[in-house]
Amino acid sequence: MRNLILLVIFSTVSLFTLADDKGFTHYKKGEYSKALKIWTEEADNGEANAIYNIGLLYFFGNGVNKDLSIAYNYCKRAALKGLARAQNNLAYMYLNGMGTNKDYVNSYAWSLIAIKHGYNSQGIKDNAKIHLTPAMLTDAERLANKMIKEIKK
């Protein structure tokens, strides 16, 4: 079941935004090092989708050693740039302790942020909420509101 959820959350369909992206072209051919090189250049220029895509390479271990901590860091960078699917994936990573410690407050907060930015993160939100006390829920909502104001969208 967990693998099915991972597939849905981190599906290849949501991996890339532009079909004409040169990195995506290399990725489809299995040329992961070429895709990584292109995305690294774009990420160095602050491109959120490139940052996110690098994170997913590390999440799945495509062309790099699988490293959930590195994946988490890239995902968080993209999430802070306003990329809703990165916000959703970050919420998932907090929920399950993938690349970071389990943190239901952050999971709930990031799912709220993703929802605010148009991503359907309701399932993650509901799963995180089960683990929250009323005080923790209030903290998560405050955190989400603070982050929404800080994120450049």
Predicted features along the sequence, with ranges:
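Hydrophobic face of amphipathic alpha-helices that form TPR/SEL1-like repeat modules
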Residues: 20-27, 38, 42, 53-60, ...
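TPR/TPR-like alpha-solenoid signature
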Residues: 20, 52, 73, 88, ...
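Terminal, low-structured helical/coil segments at or just beyond the last alpha-helical repeat
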Residues: 120-153
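Short helix-capping/linker turns of helical repeat alpha-solenoids
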Residues: 27, 31, 44-48, 60-62, ...
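N-terminal signal peptide c-region/cleavage motif recognized by signal peptidases
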Residues: 12-14
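Positively charged n-region of N-terminal signal peptides that target proteins for export
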Residues: 1-4
